[in-house]
């Protein structure tokens, strides 16, 4: 019984983290991925400002990718949130 309680408490303490492309949330590019070419510093800084652990420029997609964001973060780009019109 103590083990079950310990597991439940551990699951409540562990924060679920998500990875994904950073998304523009305002302005003319709202809903688009944050684009980049080779600027890892910019992507890393923006990722950390949004609560992530590490960000980098994913060259093949030309977009900032962020690791360690909270799963419920509104800053992760998904197809459902894609309101970007090229």
Swiss-Prot record:
GO terms for biological process: defense response. It is found in: Secreted. Keywords: Disulfide bond, Ion channel impairing toxin, Neurotoxin, Secreted, Signal, Toxin, Voltage-gated sodium channel impairing toxin. Residues 19-85 form the LCN-type CS-alpha/beta domain. CDD domains: neurotoxins_LC_scorpion. Pfam families: Toxin_3 (PF00537). SMART domains: Knot1. SUPFAM superfamilies: Scorpion toxin-like. Disulfide bonds join 32-84, 36-57, 43-64, 47-66. Residues 1-18 form the signal peptide. Its main location: secreted. Expressed by the venom gland. GO terms for molecular function: sodium channel inhibitor activity; toxin activity. Has the structural arrangement of an alpha-helix connected to antiparallel beta-sheets by disulfide bonds (CS-alpha/beta). Belongs to the long (4 C-C) scorpion toxin superfamily. Sodium channel inhibitor family. Beta subfamily. This is Neurotoxin LmNaTx34.1. The lineage of its organism: Eukaryota, Metazoa, Ecdysozoa, Arthropoda, Chelicerata.
